[in-house]
Amino acid sequence: MVDSSKAPLPFRDSALSFKREYAESLDAQDPLREFRNQFIIPSKADLKRKSLAVAEGESPSSDCIYLCGNSLGLQPKNARMYIDRFLQTWATKAVLGHFTKLEDSPFPPYMDYDDVTSKLMAQVVGALPSEVAVMSTLTGNLHLLMASFYRPTKEKYKIILEGKAFPSDHYAVESQIRHHGFDPKDAMVLIEPKDLKEPVLPTERILKTIDEHASSTALILLPGIQYYSGQYLDIPTITAHAHSKGLLIGWDCAHAAGNVELKLHDWDVDFAAWCTYKYVNSGPGSMGALFVHEKHGQVNLENKEDPYRHRLTGWWGGDKSLRFLMDNNFVPRPGAAGFQLSNPSVLDMTAVLSSLDIFDKATMPALRKKSLELTAYLEHLLLNSPEGVRPSDDPFSIITPSDPEARGAQLSVLLKPGLLDSVFSHLVDNGVILDERKPDVIRVAPAPLYNTFTDVWDFVQIFFDACRKAAQEKDTTS
């Protein structure tokens, strides 16, 4: 049994915490409870139906239990209205929509959309508005940032990253190294976990790796939250240590943005990139965003030799007042905006804006507080439920750090070998949506904007039942 004394209140020491009524009481006290109503929760019938249209005579069904915000966030109810307003503007104003502020529209002219979204996004990641740009996609932004921050020499050419990085990050780093004429076998320094059963990377190991390779390293790229284990890395400590060795460091915040309370500016992070379709709830494949610390985004035209940091350039990154002069003399906008390339998709940014407006009202500190309580409650029920409720043979373990400050919303649950397919199928059949990572892991991520303590309680009961049935099936077939 796990010591639950370290779990946040209010379920620390009450036997009532294992009752559904207790979860309902927590929901009734939740100051963020109304935000769930701002999202569309698919029903169980929606998920099983093979068409968009509701079949004639179909009976209403309850909401599914959606614990997959770490993979794709749910649709804000205002997204349709926002997009309809954009389509109406495009239809009635055409090209004039770039410059016309409409009296009955909540949106800026197209020309200023990126400034509005960047200001709101900056609040989500703890940045100055000038340090954030909503643009492109995550891997595209990583390439753009590495084109600026990875400047290898014969002596300093290595990139330090985790050995189990998300594949797209690994590919991006590998291709950047090859692009500069180096061999990834030598130039990629991979920080490996002990194994997939113990995937957490101790901060000490990361710092030691930096020390060992500092003299030959050009860049460090790490995840804010590791996608598989759910570990929240110690960004300020690692960043400060990298800087003490004279190294630049960037962070992939795909699983951190909208999940934990980041302070990218205060932590002196050099650069970061993230997507917006997970916890930021902007739709499948939606736009990415990037952060460039203000110290790297300065523009000083009086310095003729080095007026601004080298980067790949495009016209949308140029000074707005000069953009339409078409004189082919690039003068970047200060800050992250100067890293933009092309006119961003206003349609896509409208979807991002529909979610950021909700974050603006909820605020990241309040969301993080609830998230800590939700995930601790999930952990508490999984590990401390009474005998007779919890499966007797302990068919799973949690590989995410037990320290609440070292994780976000996600708990990664490692099942005993051979159980995953059956457990996952049972969960889906009972209206639970989460994701799996072969061969044996399910990732459970209660999102504080729309998930409830009752969602967590219901999931745990269904999961326990799924584990028992999977074990029985395995015994029958073995």
UniProtKB/Swiss-Prot annotation:
The modification N6-(pyridoxal phosphate)lysine is found at K278. NCBIfam families: kynureninase. PANTHER family: KYNURENINASE (PTHR14084:SF0). This is Kynureninase. It comes from Coccidioides immitis (strain RS). SUPFAM superfamilies: PLP-dependent transferases (SSF53383). GO terms for biological process: 'de novo' NAD biosynthetic process from L-tryptophan; anthranilate metabolic process; L-kynurenine catabolic process; L-tryptophan catabolic process to kynurenine; quinolinate biosynthetic process. Catalyzes the cleavage of L-kynurenine (L-Kyn) and L-3-hydroxykynurenine (L-3OHKyn) into anthranilic acid (AA) and 3-hydroxyanthranilic acid (3-OHAA), respectively. Belongs to the kynureninase family. It is found in: Cytoplasm. GO terms for molecular function: kynureninase activity; pyridoxal phosphate binding. Homodimer. InterPro entries: Kynureninase (IPR010111), PyrdxlP-dep_Trfase (IPR015424), PyrdxlP-dep_Trfase_major (IPR015421), PyrdxlP-dep_Trfase_small (IPR015422). It is an enzyme of class 3 (hydrolase). Keywords: Cytoplasm, Hydrolase, Pyridine nucleotide biosynthesis, Pyridoxal phosphate. Its cofactor is pyridoxal 5'-phosphate. Pyridoxal 5'-phosphate binds at L138, T139, F166, P167, S168, D169, D252, H255, Y277, W315, N343. It catalyses: L-kynurenine + H2O = anthranilate + L-alanine + H(+); 3-hydroxy-L-kynurenine + H2O = 3-hydroxyanthranilate + L-alanine + H(+).
